C-alpha cells in the first residue's frame, strides 16, 4: 500500500485520538451497553440501540485510525528546504483581494483548512508544489480562476 505523508503533529493527534478511543470511549460504551441490557427487552430499548450505534462508530474509527497510522510516513518539515513541498508553511497573497493567507501543506488525514492546514491533494496545494517565493500561480476554483503570489515559504 502507498505510504501517507504526515507531519509529526498530525501523527501525534491521530495517535492521541486512537488512545482516547481505546482507553476511554470504548470501555464507556461497553458499560453503557451492559447497563442498557439490564433494562430488559432489547427490541424497544432506545438506550441499548444508541449505545450499540455509538460502539459501531467507535470501532470503525479505531480501524480507520489504525490503518492511517500504519501507513503513515512522518515527515519533519524542519529538515526540508527549497521550493514548496509537503510540510511547507506558505504565505500567499490573493491578487484580487490583496488578502494574505498562510497555510501548511499537510496530508489528507490532518487537513483542516479553517486552521490553515491545506490538503496536499487540493487544487491550491497542487498549484503551489514546486514554486518559490515571488512566483505567481493560477488556481481554478468553483468561482473561476484565482491568482496568487507566493509571499514566503518556511519549513518549521
UniProtKB/Swiss-Prot annotation:
InterPro entries named among the record's database cross-references: GreA/GreB_C_sf, TF_GreA/GreB_CS, Tscrpt_elong_fac_GreA, Tscrpt_elong_fac_GreA/B, Tscrpt_elong_fac_GreA/B_C, Tscrpt_elong_fac_GreA/B_fam, Tscrpt_elong_fac_GreA/B_N, Tscrpt_elong_fac_GreA/B_N_sf
GO MF annotation, one: RNA polymerase binding
Lineage: superkingdom: Bacteria
BP GO annotations: DNA-templated transcription elongation; regulation of DNA-templated transcription elongation
Keywords: Coiled coil, DNA-binding, Transcription, Transcription regulation
Pfam families: GreA_GreB, GreA_GreB_N
Ion transport in keyword set: no
Coiled-coil ranges per UniProt: 46-73
NCBIfam families: greA, PRK00226.1-2, PRK00226.1-4, PRK00226.1-5
Family affiliation: Belongs to the GreA/GreB family.
Function: Necessary for efficient RNA polymerase transcription elongation past template-encoded arresting sites. The arresting sites in DNA have the property of trapping a certain fraction of elongating RNA polymerases that pass through, resulting in locked ternary complexes. Cleavage of the nascent transcript by cleavage factors such as GreA or GreB allows the resumption of elongation from the new 3'terminus. GreA releases sequences of 2 to 3 nucleotides.
Name by which UniProt lists this protein: Transcription elongation factor GreA
